[in-house]
UniProtKB/Swiss-Prot annotation:
Family stated for the protein in its record: Belongs to the TRAFAC class translation factor GTPase superfamily. Classic translation factor GTPase family. EF-G/EF-2 subfamily.
Broad class of where this protein is predominantly found: cytoplasm
Annotated tr-type G domain residues: 9-288
InterPro entries listed in its UniProt record: EFG_II, EFG_III, EFG_III/V, EFG_IV, EFG_V, EFG_V-like, EFTu-like_2, G_TR_CS
Record's keyword annotation contains Flavoprotein: no
CDD domains: EF-G (cd01886), EFG_III (cd16262), EFG_mtEFG1_IV (cd01434), EFG_mtEFG_C (cd03713), EFG_mtEFG_II (cd04088)
One of the GO biological process terms: ribosome disassembly
Protein name per UniProt: Elongation factor G
NCBIfam families: EF-G (TIGR00484), PRK12740.1-5 (NF009381), small_GTP (TIGR00231)
Subcellular location: Cytoplasm
Source organism per UniProt: Chlamydia abortus (strain DSM 27085 / S26/3)
Molecular function, one GO term: GTPase activity
Keywords: Cytoplasm, Elongation factor, GTP-binding, Nucleotide-binding, Protein biosynthesis
Length: 694
C-alpha cells in the first residue's frame, strides 16, 4: 500500500506528553524502536543481537528533534509529535496539542501527577484532545500504579480507569494482567522485553483482577448509556462480554473524552510498550473521528466548517518552523482538508501572501523521505515557504480560509545581548532572526536609546537553551546581561490628543495633523488600531503611515519605556497639506499623537505574575508559606499526602530570581518547585515609582 492511498481511518496523529522526568523520552524512543526500526508494517520481533544496544545504552535522553515522526504499527500510520516537558516551553506543547487528534500522558509510578503534568493536562483539555495514560517506571522503588490512577482522579479531575493490574512491583515487576483479555502477560528478560508469554492469571491476583475488571465494565457502561445491550450484559453476565465489545465501547468513550484508560509498564526495561502501541491504534481517534474543523471565510467573514475530505478545499496549519543545515527552512504543517502537491502555489491567508512549495518531506525516526503530495490527516514538512510562521493558515489562492490561531503567551523575562567581537555582529543578527522565526515566544527588540539588543523569553532556562543553540548551530559567541523582568505598560482611562507636526526650513516643509481617541482594551487582547477617518480629511494613502507611527509609538511606553499593551486607538480626524505632507510626516505625527494621548490616560506599569507549585516535606511547610508571603505571594491553596505538602501560589516574577537556591537552603534541599507565567498585573504604586526612577 503506498502512503498516498492510506485510508484516513488508519491514521493516528498523537503526542506523548509528560512531566519533565516521567520518562517520556524513553517511552518515545522505545516506540520508535519497536515501530520505526523497519518500514515493513508491524514487523517487530527481530530478537537477539539487534537488541543488545538497548540495555547498555545508559539513558542517553534522546528527544526527537524533528517535530513529527512517522511510524507504522498494526497496519496504521502513526504520526508522533514531540512535546517538551518543561514549563519554559509551554508554547511547544500548545502548538503540538493544537494539531493532535489524541495523546498519551506518561506518569511516573512513584510521583503520580506532578505540577507540570497538570499544566499539560489543562492545555489538552482546552483543545479537547482525547487521552490515554501510561504509568511508567513500574520498576522503581516506591512504584504504586493504583496510587497514580487515584492521583489522576484527584488532581486532574480525570475519569481514570485501570485496564492493567501489575504483577510484582519495583525490581520484581515482571508483567501485568490485561483486564480486558483476562490474560497475564509475562515479559521475557532474555529478549529484553521484546517478547512476552500469555499465561493464566496468578492465583493470588484472581480475586483482585475480577474486582478491577468489573469496576472497568461498570465505568464503561456509564460512559455509553445509549448502549443498553452492553449495560444489561454488565449487570447480568459480565463474563460473556467479548474483548471486541469492550474495545468498541472504550474507543467511543476515549474519543468523546469521557474516559481515560490507564496502562502500566516500564519503558526503560521494555515492558508494556507494545501494549501501549496496540491501544494507540485501537482507542485513539483518526482524523475522521475528530470531525469537522472550524475556520473563517475572509471574503464574507462567515464561519465555515470543513469536513476532513481528500477532495475538499485545502486547509492546513503551520505549527512549527525549523532551520536545517542541509535543507534550509522547514515548515511543519497539519492538513485538515484537501491535498497539497509538491510545486504547487498556495496562499498564506493569515498574512495574505502567496507561497510556493518546492519540496514535501515525511520525517521518519532518523531519515526523511520525499513525497509528491500530502493529503487530509497528514502531518509533514514543507520546504520553500518564505513567509509562513507558527499559527498561519495555508489554503488555495481562491479559498480564503483562516483556521483558529495558536495562542502565543507574552514573554516574561528580558536579557541584553551583544556579540563578543565586532565580526560576530552579523552572525548574531542572523541567529536571532532564525531563532525568533522558530519560536514565537522568543522576541528580539532593539533599545535605540541605549543601543542595546534585548532578547525576551518565557524563563531563564528558555533563554539559556537558545544561547547554547547560538553557539552550537550558528557558531556565534555572545555576551548576555543579567535576566530582567519584562515589564509592560498600559492605560487605565480613555483620553484623546490632537497633534500637529510642522517643519519649515526653506524648500519643501513637513506637515501632518492627527487626532486620536484611545481607551483601555480587554486584558490580553493586545493593541488595536482602527481608522475612523471619513471624507478624506487624511488621504487614504497616508492612513497606513499614521497606523505604522501609532504602532511604533506604542512600542516604547511613557512611564519607563516598556512596550504599551492592551490599548485601543481610533484615528478620528486630521488634516494635510497638498505639498508639504508626506508618509514620513504622518508616521512621525502618529507616533507623537499616541504618546501624548497615553500620558493623559493614567498609564500604569504591569508585571508578570507567575504560578508556582512547591512540593515540600510537611515539617517545612510554615517556612515555605512565610517565604512566599514575604515575596508578595498570594497563596491559592495547599494539599498534603504521604508526609509531603504541595503549596500553590501566585507570585510576581521580580521576587522570584534565585528562588531555587533559597528554597534549597530553607528546606535542606528536600523541596522542589515549578513555575509558569500566569498573567500580567498592575505593579503597586511604591514599586512603580522605583521602576520609573531607574
Amino acid at each position: 500500500m503506498s502512503d498516498q492511498e492510506f485510508d484516513l481511518s488508519k491514521i493516528r496523529n498523537i503526542g506523548i506528553m509528560a512531566h519533565i522526568d516521567a520518562g517520556k523520552t524513553t517511552t518515545t524512543e522505545r516506540i520508535l524502536y519497536y515501530a520505526g526500526r523497519t518500514h515493513k508494517i508491524g514487523e517487530v520481533h527481530e530478537g537477539g543481537a539487534t537488541m543488545d544496544w538497548m540495555e547498555q545504552e545508559q539513558e542517553r535522553g534522546i528527544t526527537i528533534t524533528s517535530a513529527a515522526t512517522t511510524v507504522f504499527w498494526l497496519d496504521c500510520k502513526i504520526n508522533i509529535i514531540d512535546t517538551p516537558g518543561h514549563v519554559d516551553f509551554t508554547i511547544e506543547v500548545e502548538r503540538s496539542l493544537r494539531v493532535l487528534d489524541g495523546a498519551v500522558a506518561v506518569f511516573d509510578a512513584v510521583s503520580g501527577v506532578e505540577p507540570q503534568s497538570e499544566t499539560v493536562w489543562r492545555q489538552a483539555n482546552k483543545y479537547g484532545v482525547p487521552r490515554i495514560a501510561f504509568v511508567n517506571k513500574m520498576d522503581r522503588m516506591g512504584a504504586d500504579y493504583f496510587a497514580a490512577v487515584e492521583s489522576m482522579k484527584e488532581k486532574l479531575g480525570a475519569n481514570a480507569v485501570a485496564v492493567h493490574c501489575p504483577i510484582g512491583s519495583e525490581s520484581q515487576f515482571v508483567g501485568m494482567v490485561d483486564l480486558i483479555s483476562q490474560k497475564a502477560l509475562y515479559f521475557l528478560d532474555e529478549t529484553l522485553g521484546a517478547k512476552w508469554e500469555e499465561r493464566e492469571i496468578p492465583e493470588e491476583l484472581k480475586e483482585k483482577c475480577a474486582e478491577l475488571r468489573y469496576a472497568l465494565l461498570e465505568e464503561l457502561a456509564t460512559v455509553d448509556e445509549s448502549n443498553e445491550a452492553f449495560m444489561m450484559k454488565v449487570l447480568e453476565d459480565p463474563d460473556a462480554i467479548t474483548e471486541e465489545e469492550i474495545h468498541s465501547v472504550m474507543r467511543k468513550g476515549v474519543i468523546e473524552n469521557k474516559i481515560n484508560p490507564v496502562l502500566c509498564g516500564t519503558a526503560f526495561k521494555n515492558k508494556g510498550v507494545q501494549q501501549l502501541l496496540n491501544v494507540i491504534v485501537k482507542w485513539l481517534p483518526s482524523p475522521k473521528d475528530r470531525g469537522t474543523i472550524h475556520g473563517i471565510n475572509l471574503k464574507n467573514n462567515e464561519e465555515v466548517y470543513l469536513e476532513p475530505r481528500r477532495d475538499g478545499p485545502l486547509a492546513a496549519l503551520a505549527f512549527k518552523i525549523m532551520t536545517d543545515p542541509y535543507v534550509g527552512r522547514i515548515t511543519f504543517i497539519r492538513i485538515y482538508s484537501g491535498t497539497l502537491k509538491k510545486g504547487s502555489a498556495i496562499l498564506n491567508s493569515t498574512k495574505d501572501k502567496k507561497e510556493r512549495i518546492s519540496r514535501l518531506l515525511e520525517m521518519h525516526a532518523n531519515e526523511r523521505t520525499d513525497r509528491d503530495e500530502f493529503t487530509v490527516g497528514d502531518i509533514g514538512a514543507c520546504v520553500g515557504l518564505k513567509y509562513s510562521v507558527t499559527g498561519d493558515t495555508l489554503c488555495e489562492e481562491n479559498q480564503e480560509i483562516v483556521l483558529e490561531r495558536i495562542e502565543i503567551p507574552e514573554p516574561v523575562i528580558d536579557m541584553a545581548i551583544e556579540p563578543k567581537s565586532k565580526g560576530d555582529r552579523e552572525k548574531l543578527a542572523q541567529a536571532l532572526s532564525a531563532l525568533s522565526e522558530e519560536d514565537p515566544t522568543f522576541r528580539v527588540t532593539s533599545n535605540e536609546e541605549i543601543g542595546q539588543t534585548i532578547i525576551s523569553g518565557m524563563g531563564e532556562l528558555h533563554l539559556d537553551i537558545l544561547r547554547d543553540r547560538m553557539i552550537r548551530e550558528f557558531k556565534v559567541e555572545a555576551n548576555v546581561g543579567k535576566p530582567q523582568v519584562s515589564y509592560k505598560e498600559t492605560i487605565t482611562t480613555s483620553s484623546n490628543s490632537e497633534t500637529k507636526y510642522v517643519k519649515q526650513s526653506g524648500g519643501r516643509g513637513q506637515y501632518a495633523h492627527v487626532c486620536l481617541e484611545i481607551e483601555p482594551n480587554e486584558p490580553g487582547k493586545g493593541n488595536e488600531i482602527v481608522s475612523k477617518i471619513v471624507g478624506g480629511v487624511i488621504p487614504k494613502e497616508y492612513i497606513p503611515a499614521v497606523m505604522k507611527g501609532v504602532e511604533e509609538g506604542l512600542n516604547t511606553g511613557v512611564l519607563a519605556g516598556y512596550g504599551l499593551v492592551d490599548v485601543k486607538v481610533n484615528i478620528v480626524f486630521g488634516s494635510y497639506h497638498e505639498v508639504d505632507s508626506s508618509e514620513m510626516a504622518f508616521k512621525i505625527c502618529g507616533s507623537m499623537a499616541v504618546k501624548e494621548a497615553c500620558r493623559k490616560a493614567a498609564p500604569v506599569i504591569l508585571e508578570p505574575i507567575m504560578k508556582i507549585a512547591v512540593i515540600t516535606p510537611e515539617d517545612h511547610l510554615g517556612d515555605v508559606i512565610g517565604d512566599l508571603n514575604r515575596r508578595r505571594g498570594k497563596i491559592l491553596g495547599q494539599e498534603s499526602s504521604r508526609g509531603m505538602a504541595q503549596v500553590n501560589a501566585e507570585v510576581p516574577l521580580s521576587e522570584m530570581f534565585g528562588y531555587t537556591t533559597s528554597l534549597r537552603s530553607l528546606t535542606s534541599g528536600r523541596a522542589t518547585s515549578t513555575m509558569e507565567p500566569a498573567f500580567f498585573a498592575k505593579v503597586p504604586q511604591k514599586i512603580q515609582e522605583e521602576i520609573v526612577k531607574k
